[in-house]
Amino acid sequence: MDKIIIKNARENNLKNVSIEIPKNKLVVMTGVSGSGKSSLAFDTIYAEGQRRYVESLSSYARQFLGSTSKPDVDSIEGLSPSISIDQKTTNKNPRSTVATVTEIYDYLRLLFARVGVPYCPTHHIPIKSQSIEEMTNRVLELEEGTKIMVMSPVVKGEKGTHADTLSKLIKEGYVRVKVDNVIKDLNDEIVLEKNKKHDIYVVVDRLVVKDGIRGRLFSSLETACNLSHGKVIIDKLDGEDIVLSEKYACPYCDYSLDELEPRIFSFNAPYGACSCCKGLGVQYKLDLDLIIPDRNKSINEGGISTINVDESSNIIYTELNAVSKKYDIDLDAKIKDIPKEKLDIILYGSKEKLEFNYVSKNGNTRTNYDYFEGIITNLERRYIETKSSWIREWIEHYMNEIECPVCHGARLNSNVLSVLVGNKNIYQVTELSILELKDFINSLKLSKEQEEISLIIIKEINSRVDFLINVGLDYLTLNRSAGTLSGGESQRIRLATQIGSRLTGVLYVLDEPSIGLHQRDNQRLINSLLEMRDLGNSLIVVEHDTDTMLAADYLVDIGPGAGDNGGRVIACGTPEEVMANKNSLTGKYLTGELKIDIPEKRRRGNKKFLEIKGAKENNLKNVNVKIPLGTFTCVTGVSGSGKSSLINEVLYKALAVSVYGSKVKPGKCKEIKGLENVDKVIQITQSPIGRTPRSNPATYVGVFDDIRDIFANTKEAKIRGYDKGRFSFNVKGGRCEACWGDGVKKIEMHFLPDVYVPCEVCNGTRYNSDTLEIKFKDKNIYEVLNMRVDEAMEFFSNHPKVLNKLQVLHDVGLGYVTLGQIAPTLSGGEAARVKLAKELQKKPTGKSVFILDEPTTGLHTDDIKKLLVILERIVDNGDTVIVIEHNLDVIKVADYIIDLGPEGGNKLGGNIVCTGTPEEVSKVSGSYTGQFLKKILDTK
């Protein structure tokens, strides 16, 4: 069958969608946010393919994977084995790096195990084991006529008179020894100081290098090795000594390594990992400045921040009062005035037992005698022992990541780091970018034997490197943590890995692979997709990028709107056929009938600036730049050019310190002028709004508090005495205790992404049955959380407080998202827009700076148009918007552009290419952004 036939798909908002999708083609699905693209591509087509795969496995295998429900669809025919490459499965495991997820590290481990040369870390000489035959050949390579002594080091750096050793040598018939660099006759009396270290080398033979000595030399070397457990020193009377060893050890200090195996180069295995950080390269330490942010406060005023938010704070205050009484500590005094030795008791615990009198809620008193654990000691213990990801995440707010003091971030132990290939150890190789690795691997100077051994290994590394370069990731360093990659970067890494696997007959479902990619690199990505297609695979790509849509063999436009207004196939066919369809919103944007207009004039700002001088963070090359306040500024450049380093690391962190007194460490720069002109800074990134099911859009923007108030004020709730806390899933009372109000249970898969399964007690509702009996307008709290934002706006139309907060979520294009959608399932773009919605509720100050990192992620051109209206509104209120962006529809409407590059990575990135209005940048021939802008502005 040459097509996938779908009949009556009803998953989520799909309206009985029936469609035939050609196989072995590049198929692009597009439409506004929430129209149903992902519901069709991922929740229907991919989910059914995955379900069928699981069903085909043995019952033994299925017990580990669990059952997957069938998508709501009548039938799907012609389905191939399916693989999903989306943005939501980024591996946050700190042990995952670019090198490990691309499998390049596996081949590097193999390369180092097979051709690596171990060096003694003390004497910096290669460690080699040599047979007597090899030693003989080595000596005979010396210039003819060279006078040598074959010596055996029987004593090396040892204290004592060594009388027994010398006596034994005389009995064995030896005549001369070299004692502390002086040749002595054994027949003479040799007196050595007892408390000094000595070296004693036995002179086994004296020779002149010439033809005919091989037999004698071989015999002498063998004798020398037997005397000193495999070590020989060849003393060239007129030159440096040659040290030879029969063992795999340093001949000077006996430093030795086990046989080189790939496993010892893994930081995920105990054989190679640094024993201090267990292969993480970093340690997490509680930061006292984060625990006590303001030492002018007293403990009773909340000076210790962890006590204020900890559910067990009443217990701790009981214990603190006992500590205060015992050690005469004034809990109302400013923390800075408490003597260090007394504050240490509060922080690190007591050395003697105290009397604690605990009072329960019903008034009962319980007395206990125990040590006071201490605030910091308590947090450290709980961080190690807890199985709750929520508790661990909360404690991490008070921790700092510091470089491991032993391996200094290398993750591996010193033994492993002493093995070199091309004068680099394996950690130094992982510090290279993908492009630099290609140069390094292909310029290695290897012996003929090493070349033969490494030929296939280097071929495999080159293959993976080429695929990564082709998807625009040449700037990434191999040791970059996988958790720091953007959704687009991690997806393109997985895409490169799949291309490298050379599978055929597979259905790939991708989610916006062009995210984070500069227009310059778009064609390379499209070529990679076409290459996968040409291998005999089918590709379904959810995408908004114009170039990708025009390159598609088949285009599917879903809409017309979001949520209930979407879920229909509006147009399908070749890109030309979709453009000819008058009902297609996408088609109208592709033809230019609809477009985002270029403003008639650009704002000049309020004549105030943020001026960054001498920025050197990551790959930034002493960057100097001025950002006009009161404008919409776009920071552009190819991937890896330094945009995030300049804006997120240098500027944002400096503003956070200046405005809020934050404890973060700003990126390296000489100075930043104009900080006094900013009274508020808001950073909107694609990082999750939370990492647990407790976080959702409703709680994040604060509307859930108002909704709980409404439920608490219902007649039935008042009769039962329920307050708003009853409707919280974060505290005991109304929540389901089996899942702690999560509605799901997390199953840690260790080597796979964690899996969330519905709680079998509450069936995913989060609440107990008593709480769910309380209804407002015939809906319980769970049913309200399941409403989409647009539905909830109608439901709460008579509650202005709720409506206003929901309106902002709608305005940023999230009307289709459910109020209770758990944070881990939100895409990076959705998470960013939830954060923006929260900030838009607040009144403008005229001195605020909004920093957004790729806010157009996941947005159709029509959604971008709406987002730009909001950003323009912020700037019109006098505030400043700084956006890191690749999308030309955003760049062309900016007031000011800062273009970095010219390329990505350490060598060619990190410079200011040009600055100015879009018109000014478009005239700079050396700017890739300018070249693409010119095409757009010329057609204005």
Give the positions of each predicted feature.
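Conserved phosphate-binding elements of NTP-dependent enzyme cores
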Residues: M1-K940
